[in-house]
Amino acid sequence: MGTKRIGILTSGGDCPGLNAVIRAVVKASALKGWEVYGIPYGTDGFVEVAHGKYQAEDLLLTKHGYALPGMLKGLDVLQFLSGSVLGSLSKGHPEQPAIAEAILKGYAILDLEALIVIGGDGSLDIIYDLAQKGNWHIIAIPKTIDNDVPFTDLAVGFSTAVDIVTQALYDLTFTAASHERIIIVQVMGRDAGHLTLHAGIAGGADIILIPEITPCLTSEIIRNCCYQLMNLRKSGRHFALIVISEGVHDQNNKKNKHIADYLAEEISETSQHLCDIKDPAFCDLISLDIRATTLGHLQRSGTPLSFDRLLATVFGIRAVELIEQEIYDQVVIWRSGKVEHADLKPIISIIKECHQENRCPFPVDRDGFMVKTAKSLGIYLGED
């Protein structure tokens, strides 16, 4: 069994489970006598190698990847930690040729036989292009709280993010009930509503708005939100929970980074209008306090759930197995309850096409069982 030199990096937004992947790769590789080099801060690490900031030995990961003092020495905690011990950056495609050349030079200096890339759709697109230029052998591992990477049912980090948002909705329910408030929660999801939909159902939301069904907040959708809230009021509920994805646009079809606040204002104004011209029942909504909150980067943090640790671990192990078999340019995926792998090229083609057309590469299925589940519960999803 020959020694191999492989690299591993994390790229794009962080999420729970990244360190569990790193741990699995390092431990499995160590048992084979391989050397694993941790590239700091995505492809920027290659630039720093090219510029002499790091030598190869500086990046060599040990069996545990870190050192702990005293009685903690040898304690294996990496799988429990959120974030990335390697660091991560979201910078887009290298715009200057000199930067791309430095990345390729840094990779060549390290003399790697393969590179494991833990990233989302954007990162995989960028690094695939670099790999083609540099003739790299790469294995991709999908990670994203958006769960929008094609071909895989789940990406590392998604399950924990759903749990974090669900817990937030649970906690907010009680303050909403105590003060008879309508609380609108803004959830991450640039183009995809998987996180918002899953957490909204699990967290007991009354209205869930995602870009696949509600690309923009039309006046009709806002009125329907008011009707949903009025019906809750008539049933005896004096509070409500609305979850909206950051990917939903405003009434002018413009992206609004404060879309929850925007929706709160629109519901207030529309309720007043309906009260004045149509039905006095809407006047009851006006008395309700409407508050908006954005969970932000809390969704990327937190201790990974056991399932995300398991998913990250089996993904890391499969990546090492593929390198051992010299099966390159693959993406490790989770499909129908088991780990598999697929050619990376067609996935990148889908990602590129969708990015050019401003579409999500793996959107929520409007006719899927999760959407049907929400509708069966009486949750309003923003249909006109």
Swiss-Prot record:
The pathway is: Carbohydrate degradation; glycolysis; D-glyceraldehyde 3-phosphate and glycerone phosphate from D-glucose: step 3/4
Gene Ontology cellular component annotations, sorted alphabetically: cytoplasm
Q: What is its main location?
A: cytoplasm
Write out the residues that bind ATP.
13, 91-92, 120-123
Cofactor(s) for this UniProt protein: Mg(2+)
Tell me which UniProt keywords the record has, alphabetically.
ATP-binding, Cytoplasm, Glycolysis, Kinase, Magnesium, Metal-binding, Nucleotide-binding, Transferase
Q: Which PROSITE patterns match?
A: PHOSPHOFRUCTOKINASE (PS00433)
Matching entries from SUPFAM superfamilies are given as:
Phosphofructokinase
Question: So where does substrate get bound?
Answer: 144-146, 181, 188-190, 246, 291, 297-300
Which sites are catalytic? 146 (proton acceptor)
Q: Quote the catalytic activity from the record.
A: beta-D-fructose 6-phosphate + ATP = beta-D-fructose 1,6-bisphosphate + ADP + H(+)
Molecular functions (GO terms)? 6-phosphofructokinase activity; ATP binding; diphosphate-fructose-6-phosphate 1-phosphotransferase activity; metal ion binding
Q: Which GO terms describe its biological process?
A: fructose 6-phosphate metabolic process
Q: What is its EC number?
A: 2.7.1.11
- PANTHER family of this UniProt entry? ATP-DEPENDENT 6-PHOSPHOFRUCTOKINASE 3, PHOSPHOFRUCTOKINASE
The role this protein plays is: Catalyzes the phosphorylation of D-fructose 6-phosphate to fructose 1,6-bisphosphate by ATP, the first committing step of glycolysis.
Give the family this protein belongs to, as stated in its UniProt record. Answer: Belongs to the phosphofructokinase type A (PFKA) family. Mixed-substrate PFK group III subfamily.
Recorded protein name is: ATP-dependent 6-phosphofructokinase 2
Q: Which organism is it from?
A: Synechocystis sp. (strain ATCC 27184 / PCC 6803 / Kazusa)
Tell me the gene name.
pfkA2
